[in-house]
Amino acid sequence: MTNITLSEVVELYSERCGNPHLTVYDVSGVNRDKEFFEPSKQVGDDTSNYQVVPPHYFACNLMHVGRDMVLPISQNHTDKNKYVSPAYTVFRIKENDFLLDDYLFMILKSKEKDRYFWFHTDSSVRDGMSWEDFSSIEIPLPGIEVQREYVAVYKAMQHNLNAMQNKLDDLKLVCDAYIEQLRQQYPPTQNRKVHHRSR
């Protein structure tokens, strides 16, 4: 297995949407769980300079690494363009036959890389990270078949975790409903005053 720097396999991408009237429902953000979310919390008065994130491309906010202690990054897994504010950095994988985009995203999502990103933030007020520092990071590069195996195992684990979380959520709903039923059947009695006889 060899190591490569991100600069060898990724490149910046810059495409402005050109639409000055995007709404919060058109614009995406990236959360700490490294997922796109809509609607965005807010948009500017003129959104024509908002950036396009095509399918399979990545968006990250390098300025929030120090604040969030994680790198807010996500990949567009849909078949439609997403739009993000100019605060985000958009990049893509260079054309190649030796790196899977799912494998790269899996590596960039890891807690180990988050610690590395946080440690290498700059000394600015926001504790951000420059593109140069980000793209100089090394990642392990196994063979393409090994990458596929890693991704398959990772996705299976994520699926199991999500299934378990859904079951826990369902169990919580059942428990909450049962507790509410008990409250209605057995309402709390009012505190009664106890009178002590004087001697």
Predicted regions and their residues:
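A short glycine-rich beta-alpha junction/loop motif
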Residues: 81-87, 122-148
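Periplasmic-binding protein-like
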Residues: 113-117
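DNA target-recognition patches
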Residues: 7-46, 84
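A short beta-sheet element
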Residues: 55, 59-109
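Non-catalytic DNA-recognition/assembly elements of restriction-modification systems
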Residues: 1-17, 136, 140-199
